[in-house]
């Protein structure tokens, strides 16, 4: 039963075919099964129950929460040894909003440490494996959430997206990953990584469920001054597939196979299928055009992201000292205790990011690196803002193919000719744009994804376009096969 969508589960609850306890118990059982095979969780809440009486469509529905959201009375580690025993005394606003609807949190999902990674291999609990092929990654940082939704543990899970941390894992795991407009959902209680980029979002197995969940998560919050009043936006109520006349663009340089030296067969197939999807969109009544963007601007995207995100992370995580929370470090004085705590607690990947962040924020380097990165970010955002005046959205393939093998993962910063194709989703974080990934097919029996990004506050348009394409392709509600074999 639990592998159904939200509407179907609500109907079963409403007509008395099942109880909330039935769904929760089944979800917990599936979670343990998945944990034994794919290592998707930090905590499974075996005594989870519904204490709320609500007429919400989400009442009684189990869900998962990425472990960088604060959850009252439940371990919240950020998948880091620095917070391995941290139990918050409050809920993140997004979690609180779902609890008010009567939804039941049954698990905290594993992630790349503090959300700083794109592989799902740096959690303090170990590598999170892809439910479609346990030799492959889920992507990151929201690996556990993507994995568990794909495996059918529950119909939705929370993620967070700073560069592509919802949308890339969604593609690799064959589910929907939705990052709303920046500020639609409160970040209060979300462990800060890069505050100008961080966005709360959701994984589901269809676009409709994504609309339902974000309707419940969103809202203005006096504890997060970046939130805005979205009360007049009813994503689920206004969801439709009427896309005739909509205009989309894609970045020509990134989807032209001739621009890649020695392209793999997988990349060739991925781009070939993307161009077929463009024809599908045109046959649906949409106008889709290629747009050329200055290569210098495109090539700058990964570097700008690294510079800004590392700088903000270095500042945000300066409070992780081992003195206020987390395991106490050893030392004869405060400085030695802090040094011991941070040296032992953070992984090498996190330390590298802090080194970069500290370097670009040094007084003598700020102008050359950090401030210039902020200026280039503005140029990129302005370019896309101008395009969104003419077009309803940008349509692009996600990444360069299927999920990589765990054995081939390299957690260092790389530079190759697919680098921008792998990282173009970061544009949505630069501008706070709404962006959604949906399953678009399979290559070698592994899922790949399609992304739609639109202008700020145009979430309804983005969801409607994704919904229409989803209805046409019919890759929704797919459960990952063979994860327990």
Task: Locate predicted features.
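Short glycine/serine-rich loop/turn segments
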Residues: 58-200, 251-253, 311, 396-414
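Conserved acidic residues
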Residues: 39, 155, 392-394
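Short alpha-helical scaffolding segments that buttress acidic/His motifs in well-ordered protein cores
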Residues: 23-27, 301-305, 350-358
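Conserved hydrophobic/aromatic pocket- or pore-lining residues that grip, position, or stack substrates
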Residues: 27, 66, 98, 126, ...
């Amino acid at each position: 039963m639990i592998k159904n969508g939200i509407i179907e589960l609500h109907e079963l609850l409403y007509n008395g075919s099942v109880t909330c306890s039935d769904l929760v118990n089944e979800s917990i059982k599936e979670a343990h099964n998945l944990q034994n095979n794919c290592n998707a969780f930090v905590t499974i809440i075996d005594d989870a129950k519904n204490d709320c009486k609500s007429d919400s469509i989400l009442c009684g529905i189990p869900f998962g929460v990425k472990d960088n959201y604060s959850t009252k009375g439940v371990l919240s580690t950020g998948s880091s040894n620095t917070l391995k025993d941290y139990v918050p005394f409050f809920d993140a606003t997004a979690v609180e909003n779902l609890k008010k609807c009567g939804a039941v949190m049954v698990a905290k999902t594993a992630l790349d440490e503090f959300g700083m990674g794109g592989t799902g291999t740096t959690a303090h609990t170990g590598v999170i494996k892809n439910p479609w092929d346990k030799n492959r990654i889920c992507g990151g940082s929201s690996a556990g959430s993507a994995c568990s939704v794909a495996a059918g543990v529950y119909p939705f899970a929370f993620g967070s997206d700073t560069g592509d941390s919802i949308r890339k894992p969604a593609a690799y795991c064959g589910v929907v990953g939705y990052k709303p407009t920046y500020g639609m959902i409160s970040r209060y209680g979300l462990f800060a990584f890069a505050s100008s980029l961080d966005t709360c979002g959701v994984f589901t197995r269809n676009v409709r469920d994504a609309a339902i969940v974000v309707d419940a998560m969103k809202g203005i919050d006096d504890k997060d001054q970046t939130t805005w009043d979205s009360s007049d936006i009813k994503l689920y109520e206004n969801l439709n597939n009427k896309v005739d006349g909509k205009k989309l663009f894609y970045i020509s340089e990134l989807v032209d196979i001739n621009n890649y030296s020695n392209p793999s067969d997988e990349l060739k197939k991925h781009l070939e299928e993307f161009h077929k999807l463009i024809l599908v969109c045109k046959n649906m009544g949409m106008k889709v055009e290629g747009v050329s963007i200055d290569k210098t601007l495109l090539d700058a995207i990964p570097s700008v992201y690294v510079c800004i995100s590392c700088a903000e992370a270095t500042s945000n995580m300066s409070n992780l000292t081992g003195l206020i929370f987390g395991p106490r470090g050893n030392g004869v004085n405060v400085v030695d205790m802090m040094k011991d705590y941070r040296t032992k607690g953070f992984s090498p990947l996190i330390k590298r990011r802090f080194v970069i962040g500290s370097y670009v924020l040094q007084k003598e380097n700020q102008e050359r690196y950090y401030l210039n990165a902020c200026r280039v970010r503005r140029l990129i955002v302005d370019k896309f803002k101008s395009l969104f005046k003419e077009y309803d959205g940008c349509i692009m393939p996600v990444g360069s193919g299927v999920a990589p093998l765990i054995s081939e993962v390299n957690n260092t910063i790389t530079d190759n000719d697919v680098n921008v194709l792998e990282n173009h989703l970061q544009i949505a974080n630069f501008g706070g744009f709404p962006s959604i990934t949906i399953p678009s097919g399979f290559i070698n029996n592994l899922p790949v994804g399609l992304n739609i990004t639109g202008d700020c506050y145009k979430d309804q348009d983005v969801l409607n376009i994704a919904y229409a394409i989803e209805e046409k392709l019919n890759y929704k509600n797919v459960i990952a096969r063979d994860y327990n074999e």
